[in-house]
Design a protein with these regions (language model features):
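PLD/PLD-like phosphodiesterase catalytic module centered on the HKD motif
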Residues: 1-173
């Protein structure tokens, strides 16, 4: 395991050969990029989503090349304001090629998940763990290519994926 960074996360997402999967387990995040847009949404102001351009373009490129990008959001219901906000524009991600599913937290009561919570698995063999402070800000990124960790995270993701609700069918409680 070694320390990593947000820049490396972006490079890994862009550089996949086959696929990435992403498990999100928090009800709220506080990234510097997102906070101003979340604040605007809370005030009822429009957003042109230009700040998502690079991500959406990357997803389109992966889809065109036949690569897959999947995400599961583990959520508490009723949804937090943050989760309401990201759900309000999740269709942009889906239209660009990311397959997103939601799973209410109680459905995972007996499902073992890695203790760090959020992670990405790239091409089935490289894992990045994302660590957060209580207020949702990133505190650290760690990466490993240890086969046992990659296998455990991929299997955990797949078990959650099969129970999760596709974006187009998800209706929050």
């Amino acid at each position: 395991m070694r320390a990593s960074s947000l820049d490396e996360l972006g490079q890994l997402c862009r550089g996949i050969q086959r696929a990435f999967v992403h498990l999100e387990t928090r009800d709220s995040y506080g990234t510097e990029t997102e906070l101003p847009h979340l604040a605007r949404w809370r005030r009822g102001e429009p957003d042109d989503y230009g700040w998502l351009g690079w991500w959406l373009e990357m997803l389109r490129g992966h889809r065109t090349a036949g690569r897959t990008c999947r995400r599961v959001r583990v959520v508490s219901e009723p949804l937090s304001k943050y989760q309401q906000w990201v759900l309000s524009f999740a269709d942009l991600f889906a239209e660009a090629g990311e397959d997103i599913r939601y799973i209410p937290r109680p459905r995972l009561t007996t499902t073992p998940l890695p203790g760090s919570g959020d992670f990405y698995v790239f091409d089935g063999n490289l894992v990045m763990f994302l660590h957060y402070a209580g207020n949702g800000t990133n505190t650290a990124f760690e990466i490993t290519d240890e086969p046992q960790a990659a296998r455990a995270c991929q299997e955990a993701f797949e078990s959650v994926w099969h129970m999760a609700i596709p974006l187009r069918e998800y209706r929050p409680a």
